[in-house]
From Swiss-Prot:
Belongs to the MinC family. Keywords: Cell cycle, Cell division, Septation. InterPro entries: CAP/MinC_C, MinC, MinC_C_sf, Septum_form_inhib_MinC_C. It comes from Brucella anthropi (strain ATCC 49188 / DSM 6882 / CCUG 24695 / JCM 21032 / LMG 3331 / NBRC 15819 / NCTC 12168 / Alc 37) (Ochrobactrum anthropi). This is Probable septum site-determining protein MinC. The keyword Cell cycle applies. GO terms for biological process: cell morphogenesis; division septum assembly; regulation of cell septum assembly. NCBIfam families: minC (TIGR01222).
Amino acid sequence: MNQVLTQSRPIRLKGRSFLALVLSPELPLDGWLDKLDDLAARSVGFFLNRPIVLDLENVSIERPQLVQLLEDLVKRGVWITGFENARPSLLGPGMPPAMRGGQPAADFDPEITEPKSQERTPVAPASVQLVKAVPSMVVTEPVRSGQSVYFPDGDVTIVGSVASGAEVVAGGSIHVYGALRGRAMAGTAGNADARIFCRKMEAELVAIDGLYKTAEDMESRLRGQAVQLWLDGDYMMAETLN
């Protein structure tokens, strides 16, 4: 009599990278939560179903305060999936795990500045510098409401429009050959040289290397125009392309 032996398959372990937003709380926490409420009110659904890491490097906080902060964030629909730069005394059962190896990013700063004058002045001829090519993604269809495009490794080009409620996230620059009505976040891997280009600016939110502006922050003259955005230090600059 033959006996058939069935051996169960071993568990397969795979490695993957996932993109998460990093929040850096500041004291007093009540004031920081008020700013968070303001951002959420001006960009509805921004934190919905999104992994969030809490960076505790620049805040002196004890465990009871941290527990209360997590509860306050949950009430706002913000679920923390991990801590960065947390002291061992803050970790333990019932707390999110410690995260390591994340790329540093600039703090969110909603300051508004007027675009610099575009007056031209004589300049010396620019030197030619060779740079390494970066990966890119090209999306040949419109990005519809509720859809997200994530590409943390380089530039993203959308051959079409980005609808309200849609989202494009890129480690490099973002090019939209249509109307940008949703959210566009460029330079998410700490690339302050990233830019955002669009044929028609109607965005709910734009961000470069963590520095963001909502629709209410942007000048009315930019609405409906072909626009490029970039960073100048801690300020987001904008100019029309027409």
